[in-house]
Regions:
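Alpha-helix-loop-beta-strand connector modules within alpha/beta enzyme cores
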Residues: 18, 67-88, 132-146
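Histidine/acidic residue-rich metal-binding segments in metalloenzymes
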Residues: 98-194
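Metal-associated gating/positioning segment near the N- to mid-region
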Residues: 12-77
Length: 194
């Protein structure tokens, strides 16, 4: 193609050119801890860094576990501008890992998937049900793969360094165990999973 003579030329040497990036696991302090970071700051900081869309995990305080919160945050984000905001609905009420949240209502309100944030679903029956509902609603499930029974006391990754320093290590198998279990459940349910 030919450029117009009056076209602005931007020197991009040393720069990284890419389409807008998507942050699939954003942490938001809003609602609940806006003194740390509010939605305006989050969305504009993301846009300034080349992030065009962020998908916020539900582990705010209060937890994003009902449709009205999805509606409210989505509306506020539209008014604020900056990066686009998408939301995961909490998989379980208050992220406790036991009682399922209202997945269907959150999906209708615009939740793009479901997650328990940085807390793994340890109960296999609850996880099976969550995956079945996620599949039925055509939404992915985003899991934090970590067997908390194996990592609760861990101060760092288990290995030579943790042994040498005398620190309690968290074994890598804590992640593999959850992934293995969840792969079996995904085969049963046909759910999409990340």
């Amino acid at each position: 193609t030919t450029l117009r003579k009056d076209a602005e030329i931007i020197d991009c040497k040393g720069a990284c050119l890419a389409p807008g990036l998507v942050d699939m696991r954003a942490q938001s302090a809003d609602p609940g801890a806006e003194h740390l970071e509010d939605l305006h700051t989050l969305l504009h900081a993301a846009a300034s860094g080349g992030i065009s869309t962020i998908v916020a995990l539900p582990n705010a305080k209060p937890v994003i576990d009902d449709a009205s919160m999805i509606d409210s945050l989505s509306l506020r984000a539209t008014r604020i501008g900056g990066a686009r905001l998408r939301l995961y609905g909490a998989a379980t009420r208050k992220l406790r890992g036991k009682a399922m949240a209202e997945l269907g209502l959150m999906a209708e309100a615009g939740a793009v998937g479901f997650s328990n944030g940085n807390r793994c679903i340890m109960d296999s029956l609850v996880m099976r049900r969550l995956l079945a509902y996620s599949a039925m609603l055509d939404r992915p499930f985003i899991q934090h793969c970590e067997d908390h029974d194996l990592t609760a006391a861990g101060e760092m990754n288990e290995g030579e360094t943790s042994t040498r320093l005398g620190l309690i290590g968290a074994p890598a198998e804590a992640e593999a165990i959850i992934i293995d279990r969840d792969l079996h459940l995904i085969r049963m349910t046909g759910a999409r999973y990340h």
